[in-house]
Amino acid sequence: MRALVTGAGKRLGREMALYLARRGYDVAVHYAASRKEAEAVVKEITALGRKAVALRGDLLIESQVEKLVPMAVQGLGGPLTVLINNASIFEHDTVATATRKSWDRHMESNLRAPFVLTQAFAAQVPAPRLDDHGEPVASGMVLNMIDQRVLKLTPEFMSYTLAKMGLWALTRTAAQGLAPNVRVNAIGPGPTLQGARQSDESFVTQRGATVLQRGANPADITAALGFFLDSAAVTGQMICVDGGQHLGWKTPDVLDFD
């Protein structure tokens, strides 16, 4: 079993790459700028007895994106069965401040690159095997890391949100178009890891403001990944691992109701 995880040098990408290795996968660890971190992940995976390669690619440059799946196949020694589109740009803009640059950066990284990778991945996935009932079992799975905010829209992070909305649509339409060979699912994380520009107080407040009054931990994300890996009959679905953040209902009109 072989997997490609984009943005796997740090944070949730790293956690998912290591989880896959513990599940018996050889892993291609993609990175853009985090070379040392990606190489460290490769060492951790090889220490677990699995094969791993670090692959550099700028997801804003399509010619580099197009090379990632072939390089992963070559580096790991065979076809991939899992693709995790994890790498993402998350920069603030609004309908008033968005520029062509902010639009293109988010669309290329967060939507176009996953689309191109999904095309290449699907083209090399082996034919599905038949189970004991004579029914096909998909040989490949794509997991898109989206965001709970696609179910709870706000006017903030406009270009980012629109790209993730597109990725959510891609998840469902690709699930239709690539069946029965490939399943396509998604995870919508909420507050899981503290952002680089986020204060400790802000992070604690954000986690506590969810319906469950807690955020998610990396183990919650990998548990959702594990569910999708094990669930041959599940495709086109998103699990929000967010403490119920997308269900938030305590808005001023409700709080002021007497």
Explain the meaning of each model-derived region.
Residues 20, 79, 168, 178-192, ...:
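Conserved Rossmann-fold SDR core element
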Residues 94-95, 99-107, 206:
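Substrate-binding pocket helix/loop in short-chain dehydrogenase/reductase
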Residues 23-40:
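Conserved glycine-rich Rossmann-like NAD(P)H-binding loop of the short-chain dehydrogenase/reductase
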Residues 1-28:
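Canonical Rossmann dinucleotide-binding motif of NAD(H)/NADP(H)-dependent dehydrogenases/reductases
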Residues 129-179, 191-192, 245:
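Catalytic loop of short-chain dehydrogenase/reductase
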